[in-house]
Amino acid sequence: MEKLDRLLERIEPASKDWEAKAWERLHAQIRPRDSLGRLEVIAARLAAIKRSLTPAVGRKIIFTMAGDHGVAAEGVSAYPQEVTAQMVGSFVRGWASINILAVHCGAAVRVVDCGVASDLPPDWPVLRRKLGKGTANIAVGPAMSREVAVRGLTIGAEIVQDAHLKEGYLLFGTGDMGIGNTTPSTAIIAALGGKPVRDLTGRGTGIDDVAFERKVRVIERALAVNRPDPNDPLGVLAGVGGFEIAALGGAVLGAAALRVPIICDGFIATAGALVACRLAPKAADYLFVSHRSREVGHTAMVDMLGMRPILDLDMRLGEGTGSALAMNIVEAAAKVLVECKTFEEAGVTDTGH
C-alpha cells in the first residue's frame, strides 16, 4: 500500500498555463478560429500534459493486459475460458486485430499476463506479471484481496514507467483480453455509479437473451454479496474487479505520475481508468478515451469521467484496437500545434474570425 500511496502522491494536475498558451497559438494559426474542432482541444491538452508548445508524441506502445475471471463459470460469456490464452497466442504471433491496427498506426504491442488461468508457453514474448490463475468468482465472494488489487495497480504503473524511462515511449495505449471481463467491468460501474445493473449490462462477446438475463442476475448477486462501497474504489476493484482491470488502472496512474498521455480502449480499459481516476482524480488530466464502445454501459463510464471519446465507430472488441486508431489522431493534433504557422509567421492577413 505504501508504494501505491507514493505513486498517488506524485500525480499533479496538468498545466492550465501551458493549455492557455496552446490556445493562444492555435487561435493565431492560419485558419478560422476553432475550425479544427476537437483536434484543437486534444492539442491544447497535450500542451498542458507536456508543459510545452512542442509536445512530442514519438514512440507509441499499447499494453494489452490479459486475465481470466472466476465468474466465467457462471456462463456469462459466449466463449469458453481457454480462449483467453488462445488469443494471447494470436497476439504474440501478430495475427489479431490489434496487431494489424497497431502496425497501421506505428505502435508496438506488448501483451501482459496479469492472471491468465493457464500457464503460457515459456517462449511466448509476454510480460509475466501473473497475480493468480484467474480471479475468484465475484458471484460468491471477492475477486481478490485488497493487497492483490494494490499489486495489480502498481504492476500496471511500473510497466508504463519502465517503457517510458528505459525505452523512451511517449504515448501509451491500453487494451484487454479476458473471457468474461465485461461482467466485472459492469459491476464496477454499477458500484461506483449507483445505476441499475440492467441499464449497464451489454452482450459482451455476443450472448443470447437467456445468457443476458443470467449475466444481469450474476452481476446483481456479485454486488449483493460483496457490497462494494462507492467511496472506496480500491475496495470496489478488489470486490468485483479483475487482475487485468487492476493493471489497466495502474497504467493510467503510472502515465499520470510521469506526465505522459495515455489512451484507454473501450469498456474494460475504461473500467480500469475509472478506478484510477477515483483513486487520483488528477490522473484524468492525462487520459484520453479512444472511442465510444457499443457496450451499453460505456457511455455511463465516460460520463462519470467527464470526457468525450475521440471516435465513435460502434466497436466493442477491446484488445487495444480503439487505442491504436486514436493514436494517429492524437499525433495529428500535436503536429497541428507544432507545425502549423500563425498568421504573423506566414504573412497572411488575419481578420480575427
Curated annotation (Swiss-Prot):
GO terms for molecular function: nicotinate-nucleotide-dimethylbenzimidazole phosphoribosyltransferase activity. GO terms for biological process: cobalamin biosynthetic process. PANTHER family: NICOTINATE-NUCLEOTIDE--DIMETHYLBENZIMIDAZOLE PHOSPHORIBOSYLTRANSFERASE (PTHR43463:SF1). Belongs to the CobT family. This is Nicotinate-nucleotide--dimethylbenzimidazole phosphoribosyltransferase. Keywords: Cobalamin biosynthesis, Glycosyltransferase, Transferase. It catalyses: 5,6-dimethylbenzimidazole + nicotinate beta-D-ribonucleotide = alpha-ribazole 5'-phosphate + nicotinate + H(+). Pfam families: DBI_PRT. It is an enzyme of class 2 (transferase). Its EC number is 2.4.2.21. InterPro entries: Nict_dMeBzImd_PRibTrfase, Nict_dMeBzImd_PRibTrfase_bact, Nict_dMeBzImd_PRibTrfase_N, Nict_dMeBzImd_PRibTrfase_sf. Pathway: Nucleoside biosynthesis; alpha-ribazole biosynthesis; alpha-ribazole from 5,6-dimethylbenzimidazole: step 1/2.
